[in-house]
Amino acid sequence: MTDTVPVADLVDQNCHGVLRTELGLGTFEARLGAARAPAAPGTTFFDTQTGFAVRRWCPPLLGLEAHCPPAHYLARRRELGVAETSRRLLRATGVSVHLVDTGLPGDLTGPAEMASAAGSEAREIVRLEILAEHVADTSGTVDAFLVNLGEAVHTAASSAVAFTSAVTVASVGGEALRVAPEPPGPVRLRVVAGRWLARREEERLAARRGPGGRGGGVRVEPELLDHLRWSAMACGLPLQLRLGAADPARLADFAAATEGHGCDLVLLHGYPHHRQAAALAGRHPHVYADLGTVPARTGARAAGVLAEILELAPFGKLLFSSGARELPELHLVGARQFREALGRVLGGWVTDGAWTRQDAARVATMIGSGNARRVYGLE
């Protein structure tokens, strides 16, 4: 029989708030899918690894049998109400610290509400794109925008625990985005900033014209994001970079160029390129690999995927996160699946005699919470 290693304390180093509003079956189910869109006709997102994990872990906390029908679960959820459901599920995660990315739109709880509901400590992760948009709204000229942007980054650094960039390296307008190994020069930066501000103004005027206007947001220019990333790194806080579906190899030049600058890089949500992310973390002392979304998305296969990551990355370079957004169920599933999967992998090595139980417990603590406490200065 395979031994299991308990994973006690967790620091969720990247997550989002939960919705304050009630959800019907269709809207709840859509949030189980990666695209946050309805399932194809005749199918359901409950028939995914995430869906089965939700049905396994969540119903008992609401007083139901595990794997009960989704309709029964949603009915009980509505009966208890959003606040009580969130409280029960978040407190059952066993997460002691939530690092909350506050950049998502929607009626989501912030760090203070997350801390209250979960009985945890919560700190804010500042999304650079949102910071740029807020500054643009209050700056009348390009010069004023650039000055105010620099001040805003430094002000945010005084209270935030990290910065993050929401634009993946996967695609911008359908083309691969390369994260530049250097910031744009002053002249080029002014041109790029002016172009972005002009496009925002065009969109604002179009939206005011009503249904015929385009409306919508304007994606931050890639070179302006390069400037923002380097400005954020100068503050010394960790910088989280979302990989999306991109191969982390696209970040190799950036990782090499930023080594020795006093800022750690955390590669977020690398699955299905998790092995490449782990390898990059192994090559650079300031690069870390996040395990977020692997347990929830791979479900019963989570232990196998985690074992692949542990083959390549030093154990001190791996961080847990749920990556959860909108649904407290995803917070719970991320934590429960991670604990079970890591416990099984390490326990198997103990059973085989490859590791001692003491070493397995030490590594479990490192990955679950210790590494994050060190990287984000939570100790």
Residue spans for each PLM region:
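Active-site beta-loop-alpha junctions enriched in small/polar residues
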Residues: 16, 103, 127-133, 166-170, ...
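H/E-rich (His + Asp/Glu) clusters that bind or coordinate divalent metals
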Residues: 261-379
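Alpha-helical scaffold segments that flank or form the walls of functional sites
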Residues: 26-118, 124, 147-158
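Histidine/acidic residue-rich metal-binding segments in metalloenzymes
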Residues: 144-165, 172-287, 301-319, 337
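Conserved, mostly hydrophobic/aromatic
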Residues: 14, 98, 163, 232, ...
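Mid-to-C-terminal alpha-helical segments outside catalytic/metal-binding sites
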Residues: 1-13, 19-64, 71-77, 315-317, ...
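Short catalytic/ligand-binding loop motif for oxyanion handling, primarily in non-cytosolic enzymes
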Residues: 18-22, 106-110, 133-134, 170-175, ...
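A gly/proline- and charged-residue-enriched helix-loop-helix capping module
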Residues: 126-147
